[in-house]
Amino acid sequence: MAEANQPKYYAEEIEKDTRYRQEYVDGANRFLYEQYGKATAQRDQFITPEQYKANPEYYREALKQMLGYPLNLPVETPALTEKTFLAQDGNVNIYRMQFTFFGYLKFYGMYFEQVNAKKDTPFVLSFHGGGGTPEMVSSLHKDSANYVHQTRRMTERGANVFAPQLLLWNVETYGNPHDRLHLDGKMRQLDGSMTALEVYLLMGCISYFIEEGAAPADRIGVVGLSYGGMYALHLAAVDTRIKACYSCSWFNRAFEHSWGDWSYRNAAKLFGSAETAALIAPRALFIAMGDNDNLFDSKVTEEEYARLAPYYQALGAEDQCKLRVFPGLHEQDHEDFGFDFLIEHL
């Protein structure tokens, strides 16, 4: 019979089983990295500069398939639901625009149109990052935080700019509760991803601006920071109407971070950051990363760029692809190299 205050069954201290859990997690990590090494070898066989040069559209379709639904659908030009004039500020008129997809999905952004816009005025999409909004990246909240006036630096260079709202805003700051990873999980069950959905919506917006005469088909560019840099890169890889891309503070090795909404089925065997960026070749691409970025290691950025460069070389387009590691944190470059590169290639 058990004595008072004694457990009914055999018991021991937690420390006795700690080693076993640690050995399990260590083994799981080793297994994953060993498999990643094998997957990288498979990726190197799946796509090479020579294979891409011979059949770029095969790989573009493969990327769309990896990202998933609805990128298998024809691009839909959305209906314009609302266009509200806010102000004339210097050389631009500022509008808030809302579009409707599928008859019910509302998608909005800020549009900056040159006061003296012409048919050949370049058109640029400007993407915010995690926690952001089009208003923030466009300096409408007086400060633009780590975006360093990204949108307005393009309007100052004579471009019409559309800055869309991606499903990334900070709920504590802006309200409108949402759970991106939860929604992405639902998209995965529909053979898609939030990346695929938002790339699809962005492609539809491009179609709208082209049809309205606000975006010349041969002068469309994209710029983005952090998550926005991811969207700039993926949108340009999928949509060849984009002639120049500036991706800042994102280009990295996704496997190291494995954020849920960046982790696609079989991605390690098909498309990493370098291979996704390769689908932009021979179109213009500028990649930037801060040397003291607190999220991504600039040395890994340089390693991934070394994997990317041969694709541009194979197409005789070395001058179309640039990397800049700038002195800074997780922020937009304070210098103008990327912005100048983008406008010069439009």
State what each model feature region is:
Residues 256-313:
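The feature captures the conserved acid-bearing segment of alpha/beta-hydrolase catalytic domains
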Residues 203-269, 273:
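Primarily recognizes the serine-hydrolase "nucleophile elbow" in alpha/beta-hydrolase
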Residues 29-32, 291-293, 328-329:
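Acidic beta-to-alpha connecting loop that harbors the catalytic carboxylate
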Residues 1-93:
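N-terminal targeting or regulatory segments adjacent to alpha/beta-hydrolase or S9 domains
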Residues 119, 125-207, 211, 257-261:
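Cap/lid segment of the alpha/beta-hydrolase catalytic domain
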Residues 306, 312-346:
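C-terminal catalytic histidine-bearing segment of alpha/beta-hydrolase fold enzymes
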Residues 84-142:
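Glycine-rich active-site/cofactor-binding loop and its immediate structural neighborhood
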Residues 132-134, 169-172, 229-231, 252-258, ...:
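Flexible loop/turn segments at secondary-structure boundaries
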